[in-house]
Structure formats: structure tokens, C-alpha cells
Design a protein with these regions (language model features):
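Domain-terminus/edge residues, biased toward the C-terminal soluble/receptor-binding domains
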Residues: 1-161
Length: 161
């Protein structure tokens, strides 16, 4: 059977139901019982909404008209969580690089936001941990040419001399 409960798409398969041959409602009652248990004990939680930054996720920019820019979620990051669970979701933001060079287009992929399930049910229901791409919030233009020249000069001196 399948149903939608609290933004969750539930699909159940019930095997070896007791008295299924004698009672024609046994299979239906067992399936309904499983669905009720899930609907009453679990909820979909959105950890990051599409187009919004997650907490203090940002990147540093070299040679840009801004030194930092926020990272925003490319999609929603949704998880299934026990109702009443007091465990905080473990979410990490990992940058693709420490620093990015300007110019950067809007919505450039700059890292990933990942969730690690710390409240496993059995071995867990996920094959791999959910993650989404984080991207630049807006376009970042290259800074004033003297600033860019100076930064390149300092970088050259630090690396070559």
C-alpha cells in the first residue's frame, strides 16, 4: 500500500500476516497498523531550504569586490526524524576549496552540505547520507584592478621569493 502522510510518501509491503487466509481484513489491518506507526512516530524535517544559507556557511573570495559571500542551498535538504527526538541533526558544510578567485557567476557550486544520521533505526534506512550542493548566492565581480594587481604581486613574492 502507499500513502502520503506529513509530506512523506509511504510505501509498505507486509508479508506473512497471521490469519490472512481466514480473515480477509487481516492484510489491510496489518498494513494500516504499519502506516499509522510511521505517521505517528516520524516527521519530515527540512534542514536547509532551497535558496537560503545554512547557518554561517560562506566562502572567502580573492580579488573580488567582496571578501566573503554566503553559500545557499541548491535544493531542500530533508530528513526523516523521530517525533520528540532530542538529538540535534549533524550537518556539515564542506567547501570545494579554501578560497575562490573572482569573478564568480551566481549559483556557482562551491561545496556540499551533508547530513549524518546519528539516530539509526537498525542499520538505518539510507544507503548513503543525504547531501546537497551549496552554491554562490549572487555574482561576484572582479575587484578594482589595482587591488587585483597588488594581491597577485604579494602572492608572487610569498611563493617565489
Amino acid at each position: 500500500a502507499s500513502a502520503n502522510e506529513r509530506d512523506m510518501r509511504l510505501i509498505t509491503v507486509v508479508l506473512n500476516v497471521e490469519n490472512a487466509e481466514e480473515d480477509i481484513k487481516a492484510l489491510f489491518l496489518a498494513t494500516a497498523s504499519v502506516m499509522d506507526y510511521i505517521a505517528n512516530n516520524f516527521v519530515v524535517t527540512t534542514l536547509a531550504e532551497k535558496g537560503t544559507p545554512y547557518e554561517d556557511s560562506h566562502i572567502s573570495i580573492i580579488n573580488g569586490n567582496e571578501d566573503q559571500i554566503k553559500a545557499i542551498a541548491s535544493n531542500n535538504l530533508n530528513i526523516i526524524q523521530r517525533i520528540g527526538s532530542d538529538l540535534e541533526p549533524k550537518v556539515t558544510f564542506k567547501k570545494n576549496k579554501q578560497e575562490f578567485k573572482a569573478p564568480l557567476a551566481a549559483h556557482t557550486p562551491i561545496g556540499t552540505l551533508s547530513y549524518k544520521d546519528t539516530d539509526l533505526i537498525g542499520k538505518g534506512y539510507l544507503k548513503e547520507q543525504p547531501s546537497i550542493t551549496m552554491e554562490t548566492e549572487k555574482e561576484v565581480a572582479q575587484g578594482f584592478f589595482l587591488k587585483v594587481w597588488w594581491n597577485n604581486f604579494v602572492e608572487y613574492v610569498n611563493k617565489k621569493l
